[in-house]
């Protein structure tokens, strides 16, 4: 029966003689599929869903048990004797059960498998056979009045009726194959078997009389002629002769079946068009799978998604439709390709399974209803990180160095660079060095070394000093920057270490070939070998490891793991997927057959040539080549592959296309304006100016067009008078320009008829076409989240946003100028740091590949600035970015700007004055006076005077006032806990006095502070970098500046005693080791610098973003141009 294409796939037959050569001429297009094809597919509806859905399984089971019984009593005389009476009864009335016939046992067994697989042709055979048997029983009853025949007829009629009722459950087809060839093999095999059997009967005739009965007996037993009975003969030969005669027939039938199966596989394997399409999908895929290129293996079949944008390659073994790796093609079309594959398997009664899927592919298959099992891990080398240095790669380094000393070198070439004559020698070496009779691999091997279409593959060879090749690797492309190992060979007589040398040199020299990833071997059940060998592994795990070690004697399971782990690769999981657990044994055997771990009857499938007779390529794919070369598809249109555009955007893009077609450059080169808008507005009437800006409003009154133009400085009205510029030019403005466009306008300053100051436009040109419409002209961006995400739009239409950013710039400039005027030197210290210190905060971590070193993004520049103080800088400051992995709210952002300044021969009192003056100067620069903006009762911002001195309060005094009970640095932990319980302040039981007081301060004092206030003298335990107070024990010389519930800055009298500093940082490092993410680590470099002596120093730290918040009255998200936001 013909093999129909999967749903939605039109068959395409190759013209005669064009399978291996010649190219198909087609339109060079890759048509976009209809939206219906891109819709998510419905789950595959198995048609075995009726009330009688179990009939095929039950019938197949009964026939299977009967076939096994036939085989057993055919081989065992004792069993044949014991089962004689019931066997003869069944043989007479229900089903042929010859006493000794292996051929008949095989026939019934094949029928059982076909019935269980719901094959329609098997249904016809079984129903026809049972019908004939029932008719024979009916005739026998009519002639002999045999009640057993009547009962048997009724049973057979009932079974036939049940099978007819279950007809819809037998829906699977048989693939096209060489039926006549298989029939010829069967007839020829039976003929030879009959001749051999005749000779055998003549030698061992037993009681058979001479003449026609001896050859007749041979034909009867070899062909399993069920219409002939033993009673037709005058005797019988020796019993072992019957077994051999049945075996002759079974061998002939088995040869015919294998011929049919091989022809089915070859006829339905990949065609040149299929391979061409797969190569195109690999080039245009948005997913790079290390096993993707193996989809071009030619003994596989392929099924495409209806759109042609994805495909699944597979092979059928033992009724298992075994897919290999992930689907090929665009990820969005994977579900459609998987759906087509499952429907195909359902149509032919195959059991679907997947070998070697990645985590992403396994997820797609699981969504289609399959179950996943982790099969093992793939070893992947990232060549950018690979180095032979370090103890982990000692074994590889020593092996490679030993061979290099012997003069062995490594040669790496693309296949295209190798002459064909040399490739013949390479293929001969590969065959000679193969350690198995057949080439292993299905999902991770090509099986066609030297094919011209694999020109981009890499060949790595180890060459001895005498030019003798000692080993070789062949690797296939993996996306654009990777290669995947396909073949590995070494000379059995060569030295050890050849593989280590080739792989290490490939990784070290990968850059010249544009390679960043190398996929090595696949380690089956890697976790079992790794974890099962550890101390403390459980008995089940150890037993499972022992079983794998036992089978490793033949299949090299552990050897593959050991050979890969020495390179310290990244282990990427691979998965095995199946439909039902009861199918696992058959699926496992089919997988072992496909991968070459089990011997196969007959020849292996041909993986080097295109043997398929019918292409599975859908009509949506054109420009394919019958020789399998990549198709003539154009490069993907990046605009088409982008996001779906709203209608207004599409309209503007169409307008852009019209402008381009008309020769108008929508994005021209720069030509500076003569005036800003603000300068133009100040110019006398009649002055000719050229200004640039964004169009924010257009009003067309027919004869005259009014528009509003805005640049950073101001707005101005444009007047475009048709009488002045001409009708064509005026119409062009309305045709091409939209709100949001950037425009350059030339003309004279004048006034409109209503007296409004305007620019009377004489000429203009587009500076930048805006492809998105602007928000509502009155409300702007009303959503605060949108204002943050689209800050550029908010700035374009909202003057307040521009004003805040301008004030931020003024604040930063004022801080820098004030410090410069006082003699401070500005420096830059590292942002990437090996030790996080300078503050108690959780850091961000990163990694530098060059040194294979974990680093932190700095939480403070303090420790580096103090080293500069040790070096002699008496006044130094840094204004830069700092990063802390903490919360995001009104006043916190993960990255922020900090100002730290240090002055020698100063203290925290001096820095208090410095801080106040810096903030007041910044307010003056931003607001024009020493005021901070605060929301009033109606929500509008109102100025608050911050000039003059600010209050100063001790921490303990402020907390005492808040709780109504006096506390001092000498107050004990128990009393502080009672106070916390009374006022509702949370605390941890491991905290000391200082930590509890700090928690009370943050909840009761800091959060309730309004006008700027300095809180001084913090507990020593929470100030590890601060000098002890000169007169009050238990506290340090530190202050925090707080205004309206927000901490603005802090300052210390710096701790310069290196011994005390080491003690405090050691305490912090202990906390860090105990899991405190905010505790500082021990910085030996800083401590060593401090031991060289640092002068008494005052240090100041200020959050610049919070200073801007204070001065502008805005949140931190409003004062930053681009605060961090969650991804959409």
Swiss-Prot record:
Function of the molecule: Catalyzes the production of L-lysyl-tRNA(Lys)transfer and the transfer of a lysyl group from L-lysyl-tRNA(Lys) to membrane-bound phosphatidylglycerol (PG), which produces lysylphosphatidylglycerol (LPG), one of the components of the bacterial membrane with a positive net charge. LPG synthesis contributes to the resistance to cationic antimicrobial peptides (CAMPs) and likely protects M.tuberculosis against the CAMPs produced by competiting microorganisms (bacteriocins).
GO terms, biological process: lipid metabolic process; lysyl-tRNA aminoacylation; response to antibiotic
Binding site for Mg(2+) 2: 1047
Pfam families noted in UniProt: LPG_synthase_C, tRNA-synt_2, tRNA-synt_2_TM, tRNA_anti-codon
Family: In the N-terminal section; belongs to the LPG synthetase family. In the C-terminal section; belongs to the class-II aminoacyl-tRNA synthetase family.
Manner of cofactor binding, per the entry note: Binds 3 Mg(2+) ions per subunit.
Region (Phosphatidylglycerol lysyltransferase), start-end ranges: 1-632
Keywords recorded for this protein, A-Z: Aminoacyl-tRNA synthetase, Antibiotic resistance, ATP-binding, Cell membrane, Ligase, Lipid metabolism, Magnesium, Membrane, Metal-binding, Multifunctional enzyme, Nucleotide-binding, Transferase, Transmembrane, Transmembrane helix, Virulence
Protein name: Lysylphosphatidylglycerol biosynthesis bifunctional protein LysX
Names of the cofactor(s): Mg(2+)
Catalytic activity: tRNA(Lys) + L-lysine + ATP = L-lysyl-tRNA(Lys) + AMP + diphosphate; L-lysyl-tRNA(Lys) + a 1,2-diacyl-sn-glycero-3-phospho-(1'-sn-glycerol) = a 1,2-diacyl-sn-glycero-3-phospho-1'-(3'-O-L-lysyl)-sn-glycerol + tRNA(Lys)
CDD domains assigned: LysRS_N
GO cellular component, one term: cytosol
Binding-site positions, Mg(2+) 1: 1040, 1047
Organism of origin: Nocardia farcinica (strain IFM 10152)
EC number: 6.1.1.6, 2.3.2.3
NCBIfam families registered for this protein in UniProt: lysS_bact (TIGR00499), PRK00484.1 (NF001756), PRK02983.1 (NF002821)
Residue ranges, annotated region (Lysine--tRNA ligase): 633-1128
Stretches with biased composition (Basic and acidic residues): 634-644
Primary gene name: lysX
Subcellular location(s) of the protein: Cell membrane
PANTHER family with a match to the protein in the record: LYSINE--TRNA LIGASE, CHLOROPLASTIC_MITOCHONDRIAL (PTHR42918:SF15), LYSYL-TRNA SYNTHETASE (PTHR42918)
Membrane topology annotation: Multi-pass membrane protein
Top-level division of the source organism's lineage: Bacteria
Stretches that traverse the bilayer: 55-75, 97-117, 121-141, 147-167, 184-204, 240-260
Keyword Ligase listed: yes
